[in-house]
Structure formats: C-alpha cells, structure tokens
C-alpha cells in the first residue's frame, strides 16, 4: 500500500493536538461570531433592494456561509467583476477546474437560472465585520449594475 513504518513527526502531532484544543475551547465563541456576521450580512442583503433567494434551509447551513442566487445576475460575471475587492465563489472547490452547474444545487432541485446566479459568501470568526459589510455593499452595487 506504499505505507512504511517510520518515526512519528512529533512536532506535527503536537501541532495537531494544539489545533484540536483551540478548536474545542474557541468553538462557542467562533459560532457566536459567525452568527453575528451572518445576521448583519442577511440584514444588508434584505435592505439592498436586490431580488434574491437564499439557497438551502438556513437551519441546516454553516453559520459562516451563505449561498444565494441574485435574480438576473450571472454568478460568473459577478465573480469576475468583483475580484478586485472581494472573493466569492460560484461553484465548489471540487469542480473548480471546469465550470459546470453545481451538482449540490442541482440535487436540491434548483432550476438552471437559479443555479447560474448562485454565489457563495463566507467569512471567518476573525473577519472584521465592518470590512465584510463594506465589501458586501460594493458587491451589491456591482450586482445591481449587472442585472439583465
């Protein structure tokens, strides 16, 4: 199988242990930070006046990620038009080498137009909330200019 016995990399094992300890001790704090930012993001999107649909039941989604479709905006055009100031995605990492409709969104029963306008926005626990909102405001302005 190509696996041979050898010396365990002690530094890597210790690093993994510390990462696990931090993940456990900071979990609740990180979840609260994610949710606070998600509420602010959803509020801004709602007040923006763009026509959108959230993809997926938010009760079962990660608190640091939103997948939404902006009606009348091609996700590829939005992604390319906003790459100077923010990073959004319109597909999954496992299909990044070629553009094809998201198999997850397809399996969820979304139609082709909704899938082609879907973007994923995510943030970390330490993402600055004001910076996130400012960049999202810019993204919304670009989206409004791309509506067809």
Regions found by a protein language model. Name each.
Residues 1-148:
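Pyridoxal 5′-phosphate
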